[in-house]
Each structure stands twice: as C-alpha cells, then as structure tokens.
Amino acid sequence: MKKILVSFVAIMAVASSAMAAETMNMHDQVNNAQAPAHQMQSSAEKSAVQGDSMTMMDMSSHDQAAMSHDMMQNGNSAAHQDMAEMHKKMMKSKPAASNETAKSFSEMNEHEKSAVVHEKANNGQSSVIHQQQAEKHRSQITQN
C-alpha cells in the first residue's frame, strides 16, 4: 500500500510540474469563439416553432451576440454596449457576394495591410480596439 501511495505522489508531482512548466498562448484561452456558450449555440438545432418573432436559434451569430451583450447582468457597461454596437455594425456591413478576387497581401499598401492584420489578429474579431484600428486604417486608404 505504501509503494502505491509513494508512486501516486511521485506521478502527481511530475505531472503537475510538467503542466506548470508548459507555456501557453493566453489568446487561445480567451478567444470568444471557443467559449462554451458560443460552442453550444453554434451546434444547437434550429427552432421548429413558427411565430412572428425571431427566436434565439433563428438569429444570426451577430444578432445573438448583440442580444447577449445587451441582456447580460452588466449589459449597461460601456464595454458590453460597445461590443453590441460592433456586432450590429457587422450585421449591416456584410459585403454582398461577388466574384472578385481579393488583392494579394504583397500588392496592398501599408494601410490595407495594417487593417487586415488588425482584423485577423487572434482576438481581432472580438476586440473593439482592433476593429476601430482597422476602420481607422481603411479610412486612410481612401484619403491617400
């Protein structure tokens, strides 16, 4: 019994020290798309109930996110209001489908490249700051 206990403690010590020494990218841990609430909503079945009003299951992901930010316990906070507004803007500014081919990154000017980098950052879609910076760079494209 003593050998089992000693070997168990030794294994736990090695395993815990290995986990503690492991480096991790915090952006991978806080990415909103990986949150359980987002995972459950994306895999949930569509509502079969027909009615006049839209249900949560029938809304687009931006509709759901905007409503979630508005309805949270601290939904009146500036951060949640900014995020809800950002989702509402994204719903309005969805580009129409086209057959155009996008410019390659090497053909873009510095502002176009900066806008793309801000939008494609690990937390670019969920960060208000990255979206604002991307919009700022895009406005400078038309000015130049």
Swiss-Prot record:
Region forming the signal peptide: 1-20
GO cellular component: periplasmic space
Keywords attached to this entry: Copper, Metal-binding, Periplasm, Plasmid, Signal
Localization, UniProt: Periplasm
Biased composition (Basic and acidic residues): 108-121
Keyword Metal-binding in record: yes
Subcellular location, principal: periplasm
GO MF, one example: metal ion binding
Cysteines joined through disulfide linkages: none
Its biological purpose: Required for the copper-inducible expression of copper resistance. Activated by the two-component regulatory system CusS/CusR.
Family: To S.typhimurium SilE.
Protein name: Probable copper-binding protein PcoE
Organism annotation: Escherichia coli
